[in-house]
Regions:
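Short, intrinsically disordered, charge-balanced linker/junction segments flanking boundaries
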Residues: 1, 26, 51, 61-63, ...
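Short helix-capping/linker segments at secondary-structure and domain boundaries
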Residues: 11-12, 55-60, 116-119
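A short acidic, helix-capping loop that chelates divalent metal ions and anchors anionic groups
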Residues: 4-5, 58-59, 157
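Conserved helicase/translocase P-loop NTPase motor core
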Residues: 73-142
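An accessory alpha-helical subdomain
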Residues: 30-80
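Conserved P-loop NTPase-based nucleic-acid remodeling module centered on helicase motor cores
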Residues: 1-49
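Conserved helicase motor core of SF1/SF2 NTP-dependent helicases
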Residues: 1, 118-119, 123, 130-179
């Protein structure tokens, strides 16, 4: 994904991602007069972008960010700014796509997934399959190669990054490993 997306488009990577205040500044976000509202909006934009980039969807509009917001107060806030959050998320993604700002690792993976790559390998081994993003799985499942997923369902640690357990998503024969 890195070689295909970053080099081909001449992108520069932002190693640590963007902080909330940086997103607010880059987008010139405006709140509603409530203290720090623009930073709360920026935080939701950051989360929405991560949600989209890790999803198997092709457009931001295909996702409902509210599905990821569990706190009742946050839901009320997001509902009142939803269209603005979506528009600003799309603008931020556009800025990365045009090379106006550095891209994130999530972004180049998404760019790779959206390119529908064909990987010319006979076998593809997907390690740590319990922590796969839907974007990764979309690429993996579309390949013609013999596919193998290795993982441990009891070691899933990236759910907060929208990872899913690919071991449950694949209709593959399961083999138990032992020592």
């Amino acid at each position: 994904a890195y070689r295909h997306s970053v080099f081909q488009h001449g992108y520069t990577i932002r190693p640590q991602g963007y902080k909330t205040n940086e997103i607010a500044e880059l987008l010139g976000l405006k709140g509603n007069g409530e203290k720090h509202a623009e930073y709360v909006i920026a935080n939701h934009i950051s989360k929405f972008i991560a949600y989209f980039c890790n999803s198997d969807r092709h457009k931001v509009q295909e996702l409902n960010y509210l599905d990821t917001v569990t706190d009742p107060k946050a839901q009320i806030f997001v509902k009142s700014f939803y269209d603005y959050i979506v528009a600003q998320s799309r603008l931020f993604l556009s800025k990365m796509d045009k090379g106006e700002i550095e891209i994130t690792h999530d972004f180049y993976l998404k760019k790779f997934q959206l390119s529908n790559p064909v990987l010319n390998y006979d076998y593809i081994l997907f390690d740590e399959g319990q922590d796969a993003s839907p974007a990764m799985l979309d690429v993996f499942f579309k390949q013609k190669a013999t596919k193998i997923i290795v993982g441990d369902t009891h070691q899933q640690i990236y759910g907060w990054r929208f990872a899913v357990n690919s071991l449950e998503k694949a209709a593959f024969t399961t083999y138990q490993l032992s020592t």
